[in-house]
Amino acid sequence: MDRARQLMGEMLIYCYVLVLLTGGYLAFSYVPSGATVAYTGIYEPLRGVRMSAAYHSILDISFDVRGGLLARQLHHRLQILLALGTVVWALLGRYRYALLVLGLAGVAALGGYGSADDLLSGTFLSRVPIPVWYGLHLLAALAVGAVLVISSRREAARQPRTAGFVALSLGLTAVLLLWP
């Protein structure tokens, strides 16, 4: 059971690294601003519609940036895998860290949804400025990474990783990511 818990922790770290990579790619084109602009992108039905600069940049990422929609989908899917994997990690006996990671991942997800300025528009949560949502998203994501690394180091101190163990955890992470 200890080795399974360690394997799940390693898989969570690999998912987290992929979340960081896709998030970094998305951050190059994202504009965390609540300023109202007219849409000028490639999607014809929305051309000229007034929207926040953040939502405009999300549409640009989805339609105009090469691989942008794929990166958004991967980022979202990996975040879901991270949350589900954390639940499994908790069931395997890592309660203290798993609950913290799950809570921080929830805060990061809420910050991500808030910074996109699409789902929360018109709700009481839309009163929070978009840069605050984006900052919350980034801070919570960094905190998740710190907790995962601390937990992984403590597990590895008890049971050192082997090359086969790392290969197995990388392979299982790839299978989960590519599963339809």
Regions found by a protein language model. Name each.
Residues 1-180:
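Membrane-embedded alpha-helical bundles that constitute the cytochrome b-like, heme-associated redox core
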